[in-house]
From Swiss-Prot:
InterPro entries named in the record: E_motif, Pentatricopeptide_rpt, PPR_At4g14850-like_plant, TPR-like_helical_dom_sf
GO molecular function list: RNA binding
Coiled-coil region list: none
A Gene Ontology term for the protein's cellular component: mitochondrion
Lineage: Eukaryota, Viridiplantae, Streptophyta, Embryophyta, Tracheophyta
Protein name from the UniProt record: Pentatricopeptide repeat-containing protein At3g18970
Name of the coding gene: PCMP-E93
Length: 472
């Protein structure tokens, strides 16, 4: 680099073109040497550091830009760090700062970014930190002043499955935009439950929105969420009425691929395949999800033999089936017990469509074979797998062994499954099923002493039997 300090525009261009951590460090060094304090450049540099694979070096350099030796960090740079970091890192950075500094220094965007991180994080601490942030924004008066914070908070609770608190935040908001309504309706739709209570709540809330939304108009996102709720409940009559309402709003499925795909999915899952096909054929633009919805609809409605032809049409149109396509189709075949068709489809994934099967696809085949009583075939299929079977797959076969009396194999698989669970320090929520599956197999063999040992271990690990699960 030249010893003459380049202007901000030149540095900005160089920043955009820097591909490696070394180049970013060189730019960083020039900024420090020449006393540059341009926050927009620092912000880009932070984004660059955070985009690189997580290393101690890049993390420290990003922190150096944000946290001075004395005093508070710059708000813009602090928020940029929260926004650009991985969710778990954002939560840790915020928690560390909030524990040592005044909350009054934080602004609206700080809370939006950290709540967004809590919504995206898979960490067990995300829900706890999010609740703490909820208390902070309420204490500072941001909650009812900022529609953005309210909506982000609602989204956070919905993503974490706490729909009761999400609804509480929604009901307390003084004003609601279409984004707010969509977040709450979408939250209900994305958490399927036994009896479809959440889907019904979504439909009731949509009716309230369409009738008295205080001048706020439903968007295409709203309608996609509502169609998803109808798909879950199977209420065809309401689905047809909503289709008419969609046309009235001006969202035409012929050109709106998201609305069109949602309609295809809704009609298919409500058992009205003719209407699904009508919408499908009218659509001028189709994406991979459109084709997947139509193919899955065929399988679910007993016309799985037509699926291969539709997949060929899909490939000829220039759209290649992907992992999601085959997961959806194999799940449908599993649901209605199309064993041979499922096996043929699985074989065609790699040979005809070039899609490498992943654990979910293998799991569908094992479950399909297990439910059909073809236990030995399922076991041999697992042994031939090029990837290690997971707990879900083993649990499926263990349950099948219990149902069909394959006690020797069931005991072997059940014990292997419990070993996986014992090695995992965190409770995943599925341990009850594993203990029950193994205990049922042992009970069939009359090994009551071992059944009692399992019960004792469950007590020690504080694993409770769920209502509806057999524990012989």
């Amino acid at each position: 680099m030249s010893s003459v300090f380049p202007g901000p525009r030149f540095l900005s261009l160089l920043q955009q073109n820097s591909k490696t951590l070394i180049q970013a460090k060189q730019i960083h060094a020039q900024l420090v040497i020449n006393g540059c304090h341009d926050n927009s450049l620092f912000g880009k540099l932070i984004g660059h550091y955070c985009s690189k694979p997580s290393t101690e070096s890049s993390s420290k350099l990003a922190h150096l830009l944000v946290f001075p030796r004395f005093g508070h960090p710059d708000k813009f740079l602090f928020n940029t760090l929260l926004k650009c970091s991985k969710p778990e890192d954002s939560i840790r950075i915020f928690a560390n700062y909030a524990s040592k500094s005044s909350l009054l220094y934080l602004n609206e965007r700080t809370f939006v970014f950290v709540l967004g991180a809590c919504a995206r994080s898979a960490s067990s601490s995300a829900l706890r930190v999010g609740r703490i942030v909820h208390g902070m924004v309420k204490k500072l008066g941001f909650l009812y002043e900022s529609e953005l914070i309210g909506t982000t908070l609602l989204h956070f609770y919905a993503k974490n499955g706490d729909l009761r608190y999400a609804r509480k935040v929604f009901d307390e908001m003084p004003e609601r935009t279409s984004v707010t309504w969509n977040a709450m309706i979408g939250g209900y739709c994305s958490h399927k439950d036994k009896g479809n209570h959440n889907a019904r709540k979504a439909m009731v809330l949509f009716r309230r929105f369409s009738c008295c939304g205080s001048g706020v108009r439903p968007t295409d996102t709203t309608m996609v969420c509502v169609l998803s709720a109808i798909s879950q409940t199977g209420l065809l009559e309401i689905g047809s009425l909503v289709h008419g309402y969609i046309e009235k709003l001006g969202f035409t499925p012929e050109v709106d691929v998201f609305i069109g795909t949602a309609l295809v999915d809704m009609y298919s899952k409500c058992g009205c395949l003719n209407n699904a096909f009508s919408v499908f054929e009218l659509m001028k633009v189709k994406n991979v999800f459109t084709w997947t919805s139509m193919a899955t609809g065929l399988a679910l409605n007993g016309r799985g033999n037509e699926t291969p032809n539709l997949l060929n049409r899909m490939a000829e149109s220039g759209i290649k089936p992907n992992e999601i396509t085959f997961t959806s189709l194999l799940s449908a075949y599993r649901h209605i017990g199309l064993v041979e068709e499922g096996i043929e489809l699985f074989k065609s994934m790699k040979t005809r469509f070039g899609v490498t099967p992943v654990i979910e696809h293998y799991g569908c085949i094992v479950d399909l074979l297990g439910k059909a009583g073809r236990i030995q075939e399922a076991y041999q299929f697992i042994l031939a797998m090029p990837i290690k079977p997971d707990a879900i797959l083993l649990r499926s076969l263990c349950n099948a062994c219990s149902i069909y009396g394959e006690t020797v194999m069931g005991e072997e698989i059940g014990k292997a499954l419990l070993e996986i669970e014992r090695e995992d320090e965190k409770l995943s929520g599925s341990e009850c099923e594993d203990y029950v599956a193994l205990s049922n197999v042992l009970a069939h063999k009359g090994k009551w002493v071992e059944v009692e040992k399992l019960r004792k271990e469950m007590k020690e690990r504080r694993i409770k039997t769920r209502p509806g699960y057999s524990f012989v």
